[in-house]
């Protein structure tokens, strides 16, 4: 029945919103390209989109950062117990210790180590999305750690299950309640030969300067279901530019349709590819960076880390401390020009109207 309702909703949505023509022979692997055609993660921006300049303030603390989603799409792997740990984001406590009951068991290779020695930063967001043995159910939890091979993993919060064939909106990005797999840059994307990125992205920005809060909106908008717990005392407290009420947690941020991307004079090829994705699909605001930087969400899985592949392909990391590099300057070119799609709603995903590019192809049988 649930699958029928998803299909019915998709037909109704497409009847009300035009779409560009797709390649009728193309298919996709749900493990690499999940969720329905009309999921927020797959829906292109429409010609009916209404753009409001976000006026994101230029970052000062670093040139660019990433936020890694832990993605495990290995449903045939042996089951690993994931037990309770209550360290959370307290830097004085360890996420490695088992401190309570087993939350659930999931197919994750024991050889995959996610620990203070391997992760970035002191207390990363650490959202895990793992495909269960039924090859359909995605479980999500946060903050995940697996510090020792042969031992249980740990985490604290468990989110509602998602269907890999469904809309996949929600999950383990705690600042917004949005997915820890949808929107992530996946291994095999953004290479010299992979072609355009064909899904929405996810970004984090600095809440104190860029995420609006008031008592009415509580600092978030659809599809986010919340903002950070500290939002009322934190968001917009260091804002210098004009107020942009539309730029709240969950906002769909995009380069406007009228913008000629070549006019931005990108210095690096991967930035130009990213810019096209920001224009055709946009990026959902899913977390606060909590320091004065931009972040794009990327995959870390047992198969590898996106940034390692990026370095092999392009000769430099997505992460840079310096603002005075070609990549950092390109990130300013993108983020400082982002606009909120202000009419992005459940019935007009991407703003509605004919889509800028074709919808995702059907799933491979």
Predicted regions and their residues:
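Sec-dependent signal peptide cleavage junction
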Residues: 18-19
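Sec-dependent signal peptide recognition
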Residues: 2-7
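C-terminal motif of bacterial Sec signal peptides marking the signal peptidase cleavage site
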Residues: 14-15
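Short, surface-exposed polybasic-aromatic patches that bind anionic ligands, especially phosphate groups
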Residues: 23-365
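Short, linear, compositionally biased motifs with a strong N-terminal bias
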Residues: 10-11
